[in-house]
């Protein structure tokens, strides 16, 4: 029997879905991402969403100002799609290298999404322009109708929004973000080269029982919400198969402790401190470490048409305890897996 590996050396990874927030929160969380990842797709859902080139440039600079000396990190900015977005502004941002992609939030699907798209038809001219440009569309794939059960919103989105959209715009590059269901896993697997998916560590590690049995665990509450075990297993099998159109997207989404531990808590897991080690643990459990580097470091650049990162990262089998909280101005952040021990950690 071969002894388990003690070191994993991979090409420096990228995070293809992260929330860095703004202000004091941004200054606190950016270093956890910039230390490990060469690039990150930064979500545009600030309180005032990023809908113009100038706003994206200013936000990018605030991010870069928060990157510690010695970290080689490039934030990749995204445009928040709204019903009234100017297609010319989007094209200008793409050509000038400011916007890497555009994000479709169905209105009121998640944090700061009230400005989101009310219907795909409302933004069809923008999407047609994106198809011509080869600009990726990043999709939060849930319907938000009040009569649809929260656990069914992703599957319903595939049938009523995603598939009709892709039938209409056959060469539009689409990233189905943070997929959570066997329906989405199969849909992406069956798709063509214009369709890819990101998957979070929490959706690979946990299911809704982990969040709800024996007490509510608010720090596992995110959107899309954790699903049944059968869906978790489908996601694990997808990544373990070496499927090349699935890649790392943490959806790290920090909220202060008092906004999570409350009678109406916010959705999001702040997983940046432990995500890479968490992914490694899942791949090891699935006997799929041979596919770990591709998921973290190769598949995303291939889909986006970008070069892989030049540097390397080493993970070591060295148990580390995740801190119970992280200081944040006059509050604190509770990270994903707070107080728990993970068996893979990034070598400093």
From Swiss-Prot:
The keyword Metal-binding applies. Homodimer. The modification N6-carboxylysine is found at residue 103. Substrate binds at residues 19-21, 45, 140, 223, 255, 267. Zn(2+) 2 binds at residues 103, 140, 178. Pathway: Pyrimidine metabolism; UMP biosynthesis via de novo pathway; (S)-dihydroorotate from bicarbonate: step 3/3. The active site is at residue 251. Belongs to the metallo-dependent hydrolases superfamily. DHOase family. Class II DHOase subfamily. It comes from the Bacteria. The lineage of its organism: Bacteria, Pseudomonadati, Pseudomonadota, Gammaproteobacteria, Enterobacterales. The keyword Hydrolase applies. GO terms for biological process: 'de novo' pyrimidine nucleobase biosynthetic process; 'de novo' UMP biosynthetic process. Keywords: Hydrolase, Metal-binding, Pyrimidine biosynthesis, Zinc. GO terms for molecular function: dihydroorotase activity; zinc ion binding. Its cofactor is Zn(2+). GO terms for cellular component: cytosol. This is Dihydroorotase.
């Amino acid at each position: 029997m071969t002894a388990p590996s003690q070191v994993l050396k991979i090409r420096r990874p990228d995070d293809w879905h992260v929330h860095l927030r703004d202000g004091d929160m941004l200054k606190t969380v950016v270093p956890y991402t910039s230390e490990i990842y060469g690039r990150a797709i930064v979500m545009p859902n600030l309180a005032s969403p990023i809908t113009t080139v100038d706003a994206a440039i200013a936000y990018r600079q605030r991010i870069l100002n928060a990157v510690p000396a010695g970290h080689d990190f490039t934030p990749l900015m995204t445009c928040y799609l709204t019903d009234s977005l100017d297609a010319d502004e989007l094209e200008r941002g793409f050509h000038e290298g400011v916007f890497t992609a555009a994000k479709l939030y169905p209105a009121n699907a998640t944090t700061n999404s009230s400005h989101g798209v009310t219907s795909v038809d409302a933004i069809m001219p923008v999407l047609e322009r994106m198809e011509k440009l080869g600009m990726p569309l990043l999709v939060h794939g849930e319907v938000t109708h009040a009569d649809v059960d929260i656990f069914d919103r992703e599957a319903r989105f595939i049938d009523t929004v995603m598939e009709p959209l892709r039938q209409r715009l056959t060469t539009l590059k689409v990233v189905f973000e943070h997929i959570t269901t066997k329906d989405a896993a199969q849909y992406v697997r069956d798709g063509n080269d214009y369709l890819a998916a990101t998957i979070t560590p929490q959706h690979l590690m946990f299911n809704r029982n982990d969040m709800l049995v024996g007490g509510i665990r608010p720090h596992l509450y995110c959107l899309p919400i954790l699903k049944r075990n059968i869906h978790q297993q489908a996601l694990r099998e997808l990544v373990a198969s070496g499927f090349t159109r699935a890649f790392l997207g943490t959806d790290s989404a920090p909220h202060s402790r008092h906004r999570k531990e409350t009678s109406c808590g916010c959705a999001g897991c702040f997983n940046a401190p432990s995500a890479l080690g968490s992914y490694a643990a899942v791949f090891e459990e699935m006997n799929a470490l041979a596919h770990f580097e591709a998921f973290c470091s190769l598949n995303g650049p291939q889909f986006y048409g970008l070069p892989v990162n030049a540097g390397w990262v080493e993970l070591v089998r060295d148990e580390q305890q995740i801190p119970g909280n992280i200081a944040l101005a006059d509050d604190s952040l509770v990270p994903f897996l707070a107080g728990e021990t993970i068996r893979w950690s990034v070598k400093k």
